[in-house]
Curated annotation (Swiss-Prot):
Taxonomy, superkingdom: Bacteria
Database matches in Pfam families: PCRF, RF-1
Gene assigned in the entry: prfA
General function of this protein: Peptide chain release factor 1 directs the termination of translation in response to the peptide chain termination codons UAG and UAA.
UniProt entry keywords in alphabetical sequence: Cytoplasm, Methylation, Protein biosynthesis
Protein name: Peptide chain release factor 1
Length: 357
């Protein structure tokens, strides 16, 4: 571990030196790349620096206890020694986590797809509530949300919605939301007061740039048409809506949220790239299925990950056995406790596997 840490320190120092080179400063592409790498290494460098300082404090405290005759100074040194030893243990754990292999997609922006599942209109209402929950969470973090496409129902539900979230570390945080979400409550459409179980699926995909995924023009059909609202009424007198059909996969993308055909086309292609990149990522994940079974946030879209029980005001994440009784706050976007617990469980599983290896 410490060889890797020293290698990281050397790399950090090399980057810092390069950033002071006028030739690098004038090369904006290289400068930005180095700045990004330096920023990603900074937490590890800061933690390792504190670790080395604590180890030095332990040496100094032991020397005082060995050489000093003043009882008051020895008592202070003993207190400093105990504090430093405890902190060293914490820092060693933090360093192990920081040295875990990083998901190459963690720094990417994301495309989120929510689809109503079993439960008819109630499932569509739940899908719309999940959408609002994620929008509120993203806004609280200062992230930008951009709707790519959506299919609303007449009473405020959503059969499906696809949106982009732009913000630092969006994928690293939101990837744990992929899976089937289940709601248990008495639907507003239910006259006899029976509790119904409905579902909605969430897929969190890293945004794919053109360099990440190549789309051959001959594999795409582009149709333009007039945008329409609920019930099919025309909401635009120009052919601004865009539909993409990707022949090899059968994926169809429809975008009409913007007034400009060019903007709708850009959004449609962004969504298509994300879906194609996600297919490739899922293939790679499936090839490592055995290694992933013990991990949280594996992205298994069929996995029932969470239940929202309205009569009990309860939310349970089944992957980690976490139950919280603050459903109203969670539906309003307060999901950080759940995400933090998923991240911690994922890190613990990876550390355990690293220990086995």
């Amino acid at each position: 571990m410490f060889d890797r840490l020293e290698d990281t320190v050397n790399r950090y120092e090399d980057i810092t030196a390069e950033l002071g080179n006028p030739d690098v400063v004038n090369d904006q592409e290289k400068f930005k790349k180095l700045m990004k790498e330096q920023s990603s290494l900074a937490p590890l460098i800061e933690t390792y620096t504190e670790y080395k300082n604590c180890k030095k404090n332990i040496e100094d405290s032991l020397a005082i206890l060995d050489e000093e005759t003043d009882e008051e100074l020895k008592e202070m040194a003993k207190e400093e020694l105990n504090e430093s030893k405890a902190r060293v243990e914490e820092l060693e754990h933090e360093l192990k986590i920081l040295l875990l292999p990083k998901d190459p997609n963690d720094d990417k922006d994301i495309v989120v797809e929510i689809r109503a599942g079993a439960g008819g209109e109630e499932a569509a209402l739940f899908a719309a509530e999940l959408f609002r929950m994620y929008v509120h969470y993203a806004q609280a973090r200062g992230w930008k949300v951009e709707v790519l496409s959506g299919d609303e129902t007449g009473i405020g539900g959503m059969k499906e919605v696809e949106f982009m979230v732009k913000g630092q570390g969006a994928y690293s945080i939101m990837k744990y939301e992929s899976g089937v979400h289940r709601v248990q409550r008495i639907p507003v459409t239910e006259s006899n007061g029976r509790i119904q179980t409905s579902t909605a699926s969430v897929a969190v995909m890293p945004e794919a740039e053109e360099v990440d995924i190549h789309i051959d023009e001959k594999d795409i059909r582009i149709d333009v048409m007039r945008a329409s609202g609920n019930g099919g009424q025309c909401v635009n007198t120009t052919d601004s809506a865009v539909r993409l059909t990707h022949y090899p996969t059968g994926i169809v993308i429809y975008s009409q949220t913007e007034k400009s055909q060019i903007q709708n086309k850009e959004k449609a292609f962004a969504l298509l790239r994300a879906k194609l990149y996600d297919i490739e990522t899922q293939k790679a994940h499936d090839a490592e299925a055995d290694a992933r079974r013990s991990q949280i946030g594996t992205g298994d879209r069929a996995e029932k990950i969470r239940t929202y029980n309205f009569p009990q005001g309860r939310v349970t994440d089944h992957r980690i056995g976490l139950t919280l009784y603050k459903l109203d706050k969670i539906m309003d976007g307060d999901i950080q406790d759940i995400i933090d617990a998923c991240i911690a469980a994922d890190q613990a599983a990876k550390l355990a596997k690293m220990g086995e290896d």
